Amino acid sequence: GDVYKRQVSVGEGYGRVNLIGEHLDYNGGCVLPLQIKNSIICELSKNREIDCISIASDKYQKTLSIEKLKKTDDWADFIIGSCLFFGEKYSIIIKELSFNISSTLPLGIGLSSSAAMTVSTLKALNNFYKTTMSDDELIDLAYDIENSFVGVGGGIMDQFVSVLGNQNQALY
């Protein structure tokens, strides 16, 4: 019935290039990043899988039990970490959701696809649950997920640019 009406929430996270200062943001140095138009989009909807979430892209399909939600050592960790950290922050049990991921952002070549993935997922969760996460909270949470859960070491520049960047203006 009405419980499974297809409510779709979308989040988008952008990639970036860094004009100067690569590897300096996590050492306290100056950087000059620029958001690019390439992005990762997370479409989030309710599913009928009790106590599970499903994650899909054009090359990936996985259904995960909420009871056993833990690191998988693949790119799904960005979504899993987002579910766990977002759920903890807002006291929400994340379940019965489908995450459909699409991307125009090449992965693994230094354009901050990890930040874009985490940001897009958190934005979709924020929209779906109608929470009031500020941009600063989103940036901090995405940073914590990448560093504490996924294990991607780095500074906060990538998350900052993905959320607050402008494709026509570098950030200093």
Specify the residue positions occupied by each region the protein language model found.
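Short, small-residue-biased leader/transition segments that mark boundaries at the very start
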Residues: 1-4
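A short glycine/serine-rich beta->alpha loop
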Residues: 25-29, 64-73, 103-111, 146-151
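ATP-dependent small-molecule kinase catalytic core of the GHMP/sugar-kinase superfamily
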Residues: 27, 127-172
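Structural signature of FAD isoalloxazine-binding scaffolds in flavoprotein oxidoreductases
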Residues: 29-48
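DPxDG-like acidic metal-binding loop motif
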Residues: 35-36, 111-131
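Glycine-rich, flexible beta-strand/loop modules in the N-terminal catalytic cores of phosphate-handling
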Residues: 43-90
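Glycine- and acidic-rich phosphate- and metal-coordinating loops
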Residues: 83-84, 88-107
